[in-house]
Design a protein with these regions (language model features):
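Ubiquitin-like/PB1-type beta-grasp interaction modules and other compact soluble beta-rich domains
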Residues: 1-76
Length: 77
């Protein structure tokens, strides 16, 4: 039973993490996933989250087999 976690751009550097699978024990939502991989590091206010490639917020429920991604806001010109 696992959730795949991916971090992109500055989130990858902030957490020193590209990709990891975590056990689903005690994981209910995106915020729990963040805490599992980040420990004491707070989630920056502008962090974007996605579950199975759909935008989600920290309260979004997750379950076994989900993919959760964290990335900074996208900018362009």
């Amino acid at each position: 039973m696992a959730i795949k976690v991916k971090c992109f751009a500055s989130m990858r550097e902030y957490l020193d993490l590209s990709e990891r699978e975590i056990a689903t024990d005690g994981i209910r939502n995106v915020a729990d996933v963040w805490q599992s991989v980040a420990g004491e590091k707070p989630m920056p206010d502008n962090t974007l989250c996605a579950v199975n490639q759909n935008q989600a917020d920290a309260k979004f429920s997750v379950s076994d087999g989900d993919e959760v991604a964290f990335f900074p806001p996208v900018t362009g010109g």
